[in-house]
Design a protein with these regions (language model features):
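Conserved active-site "lid/cap" helical segment
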Residues: 1-79
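Short, well-ordered turn and helix-capping elements at secondary-structure junctions
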Residues: 13, 85-86
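Conserved catalytic cysteine-centered active-site region
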Residues: 38-57, 86-112
Length: 112
């Protein structure tokens, strides 16, 4: 007997911190300039999380709460949380587990 598994991404959320760090801000901190950075990376500004005590899982939580509000979901309906980050809150547990706990998605699986 063959079982066919079917999966679909039904929602995607995002969160961008309010604080901007521009290349001009970086010029004041290190020996660089806007032109040098833009010519090598194409980046002119980046967003940074400055609130004390906040971390990657808090940004992920905001993204999922956006989905929950828009789609009128119960957090228990969330089957899987995928989180990719180079700045985890801590090495273990995974950031996706922390996000799931914060939003009340108690039955989710995690992809990291």
């Amino acid at each position: 007997m063959t079982t066919t598994l079917r999966a679909a991404i039904t929602a995607v959320g995002g969160y961008v911190p309010e604080t901007k760090l521009t290349n001009f801000d970086l010029e004041k901190m290190v020996d660089t300039n806007d032109e040098w950075i833009k010519s090598r990376t194409g980046i002119s500004e980046r967003r940074i999380l400055r609130e004390p005590g906040k971390a990657s899982s808090d940004m992920g939580t905001e993204a999922i709460l956006e989905i929950i509000r828009k789609k009128k979901l119960d957090p228990l309906e969330i089957d899987c949380i995928i989180c990719a980050t180079v700045t985890p809150d801590m090495p273990f547990p995974s950031t996706a587990n922390l996000i799931g706990d914060k939003v009340g998605a108690k039955t989710h699986s995690v992809l990291i």
